[in-house]
Amino acid sequence: MSAATDEILEKLKSLTLLEAAELVKQIEETFGVSAAAPVGGMMVAAPVAGAAAAPAEEVEEKTAFDVILEEVPADKKIAVLKVVRSLTGLGLKEAKEVVESTPKPVKEGASKEDAEAAKKELEEAGAKVSIK
């Protein structure tokens, strides 16, 4: 590795969890990307021979789902906050912002199973959740 990348890596190692979350947010905003890990592997472009069949396959079934936190009753905020933190790995401040600024995506690009599991956990904690 080059000296520049070594230096960046060392600085990243010294970040607190809160600073790392802020860094991720800034990178997402600056470069217009999402840090959500793709569940189910990378999407690969269809071969040229199968290009005509590709659009029909995409219509058949959606593979990436977003879990949207729609509403949180005031008396359930703490329970929902704990679930949001466990699902996302966010710090307390970031998770609180998500819970208090509904509707807000909690998980993006999740598999159907993961999205359903997250929805179930959030609903058990008292939140109103949708999957898109």
UniProtKB/Swiss-Prot annotation:
Cellular component GO terms, alphabetical: cytosolic large ribosomal subunit
InterPro entries registered for this protein in UniProt: Ribosomal_bL12, Ribosomal_bL12_C, Ribosomal_bL12_C/ClpS-like, Ribosomal_bL12_oligo, Ribosomal_bL12_oligo_N_sf
Keywords assigned by UniProt, alphabetized: Ribonucleoprotein, Ribosomal protein
Pfam families: Ribosomal_L12, Ribosomal_L12_N
Presence of keyword Aminoacyl-tRNA synthetase: no
GO molecular function per UniProt: mRNA binding; structural constituent of ribosome
Region named Disordered: 100-132
Top-level taxon of origin: Bacteria
Positions in coiled-coil regions: none
Biased composition (Basic and acidic residues): 100-126
Gene Ontology biological process terms from the UniProt entry: translation
Similarity comment: Belongs to the bacterial ribosomal protein bL12 family.
Free-text function comment from the UniProt entry: Forms part of the ribosomal stalk which helps the ribosome interact with GTP-bound translation factors. Is thus essential for accurate translation.
Description of how the protein assembles with itself and partners: Homodimer. Part of the ribosomal stalk of the 50S ribosomal subunit. Forms a multimeric L10(L12)X complex, where L10 forms an elongated spine to which 2 to 4 L12 dimers bind in a sequential fashion. Binds GTP-bound translation factors.
Name of the protein: Large ribosomal subunit protein bL12
Species of provenance: Thermosynechococcus vestitus (strain NIES-2133 / IAM M-273 / BP-1)
Taxonomic lineage from the root: Bacteria, Bacillati, Cyanobacteriota, Cyanophyceae, Acaryochloridales
